[in-house]
């Protein structure tokens, strides 16, 4: 099965909605690789959803490398984009290029950076050295402290300026997070590269959701997500039945073990 490419994403602009899911591990990526979803984002949100950190700020390159390897091994078809974690690109162009190259060598088809005008040089240098970049504007979780928390971003002029700067720097796509739908629509119309929304309305070229939110596995259900399954409840019920079967002696059943008499 042929993996989707950057060119495939670009061709979908304004024609076919792009679907992406944030995924972190081999077993989940293996299941999802058998669907028609277009791309996987190995997100630094693994800090909260997998590692139990309070935010994305504690996530390191080692964490991202580990989870990138797992997802890559499971995914023959989907385009794989990997978040560059906090302080893996901010210090200098050289640091940014080096770390982007490491993620690419582990199988990432592209990397994602948070920020707009302020990361122009980082994006341009990473692209120049051969690693595709997806931008990320609006609510940028790595900068939530300076934003005063996880708030809807309303500065239309800055958002448009950020999007245009990312496109000029060579980004092939832009994630727009937690922005008014009308602003996301304007950005989508102004740039020639695909926009991917999360909490920014229906007018982008595509959507991305965290698989934990889609399956109802998280502690908090974000307003912008849709829970397609209450997997947390189903897991609890399955474990409850297992415990009951063990205590009542109905597990293991005769079909679950071997004996000399069989």
Swiss-Prot record:
Principal location listed in the UniProt entry: cytoplasm
Compartment(s) where it occurs, according to its Swiss-Prot or TrEMBL record: Cytoplasm
Annotated binding of 3-methyl-2-oxobutanoate, by residue: 44-45, 83, 112
Keyword Chloroplast: no
GO cellular component term of the entry, any: cytoplasm
Origin organism lineage: Archaea, Thermoproteota, Thermoprotei, Sulfolobales, Sulfolobaceae
Active site: 177 (proton acceptor)
Catalysed reaction, written as an equation: 3-methyl-2-oxobutanoate + (6R)-5,10-methylene-5,6,7,8-tetrahydrofolate + H2O = 2-dehydropantoate + (6S)-5,6,7,8-tetrahydrofolate
Name of the molecule in the record: 3-methyl-2-oxobutanoate hydroxymethyltransferase
GO molecular-function term, one example from the UniProt record: magnesium ion binding
Family: Belongs to the PanB family.
Pathway assigned in UniProt: Cofactor biosynthesis; coenzyme A biosynthesis
Keywords: Coenzyme A biosynthesis, Cytoplasm, Magnesium, Metal-binding, Transferase
InterPro entries on file: Pantoate_hydroxy_MeTrfase (IPR003700), Pyrv/PenolPyrv_kinase-like_dom (IPR015813), Pyrv_kinase-like_dom_sf (IPR040442)
Cofactor: record remark: Binds 1 Mg(2+) ion per subunit.
The enzyme's E.C. designation: 2.1.2.11
General function of this protein: Catalyzes the reversible reaction in which hydroxymethyl group from 5,10-methylenetetrahydrofolate is transferred onto alpha-ketoisovalerate to form ketopantoate.
UniProt-listed Gene3D superfamilies: Phosphoenolpyruvate-binding domains (3.20.20.60)
Residues of the signal peptide: none
Record-listed Mg(2+) binding positions: 44, 83, 114
Cofactors required: Mg(2+)
Record-linked NCBIfam families: panB, PRK00311.1
Transmembrane segments: none
GO BP terms, alphabetized: coenzyme A biosynthetic process; pantothenate biosynthetic process
Subunit structure and binding partners: Homodecamer; pentamer of dimers.
